[in-house]
Amino acid sequence: MVIKFLSALILLLVTTAAQAERIRDLTSVQGVRQNSLIGYGLVVGLDGTGDQTTQTPFTTQTLNNMLSQLGITVPTGTNMQLKNVAAVMVTASLPPFGRQGQTIDVVVSSMGNAKSLRGGTLLMTPLKGVDSQVYALAQGNILVGGAGASAGGSSVQVNQLNGGRITNGAVIERELPSQFGVGNTLNLQLNDEDFSMAQQIADTINRVRGYGSATALDARTIQVRVPSGNSSQVRFLADIQNMQVNVTPQDAKVVINSRTGSVVMNREVTLDSCAVAQGNLSVTVNRQANVSQPDTPFGGGQTVVTPQTQIDLRQSGGSLQSVRSSASLNNVVRALNALGATPMDLMSILQSMQSAGCLRAKLEII
């Protein structure tokens, strides 16, 4: 009885220690993806915040072409001083298995010198793919997340005003051809390449569906043998994607954004014992102009300007501090915070730690 209890307890501890995730959260089906669409159009109804047409001739040209298609002829040489029109680029993503009549969201971005797209309406804009075929038509009122006001030479702005979004603003007019259901194999692609995870997913599928049902081709691709036919493959994939797989530990990685100074690390990062000295060196250059004028204005003297430069060099910090070995992320954070370094200093410290072999992680700078 005691042996059974201990065995059940050990099994419970092992099960809770291993983190299980569904295959659908770790992979995607090769070939089932979105496709980008792009179009050029006009936004009207702006409250005097549109393009300055004298500086954006393409806006006037586009408007003339649109009016001519509507049967309106603008006299040659007419200088239209329009403030309520803006030229925009419209982008969208065509989802996999998108059908005719289905609506998708579009993003509208100004390409001229419009001050704001707030309150504007996008006129009918064809959206094309890389093959120059029209796959959707976009039109509708633009929702801009920003706000702004100006008066007397002063202005206040919150967030971006030259871009917006139209929810369900485009209607799919052409469907993409799909190869789904053709053939007896499908490839599952891992979100992150990992040989052990690829093999583990293949083993899990083989245990449930029989040996030979899945094969790990490389660190990212698992080939699965599926029955022929759309409906059969849909049912087969639905069962596979809901299978649970124990997630293996990730590679220890530290990501540094050199533009913003942000540092992000995952929980696998560890440190070995080391000593760190970080000093701050600042140089201040101050230049002043001294003006010397003669005491007697009519004595024939000359005004002389002499520059005076003062250079101040200061160095602070630099004491050697010990960093203890840390085996968990919380301890790593405490050890790095104990140095009292700024994020910019921390980037150079982490690079030096990796060079010294004290940082047990991959360092990626973006």
Swiss-Prot record:
**Residues spanning the membrane:** none
Q: Name one GO molecular function term.
A: structural molecule activity
Question: Which locations, inside or outside the cell, does it occupy?
Answer: Periplasm; Bacterial flagellum basal body
Q: Where is the signal peptide?
A: 1-20
- Extract one GO BP annotation from the record: bacterial-type flagellum-dependent cell motility
- Pfam families, per this entry? FlgI (PF02119)
Concerning InterPro entries, the annotation shows:
Flag_FlgI
Gene Ontology CC terms, in alphabetical order: bacterial-type flagellum basal body, distal rod, P ring; outer membrane-bounded periplasmic space
Similarity comment: family membership: Belongs to the FlgI family.
For this entry, the protein name equals: Flagellar P-ring protein
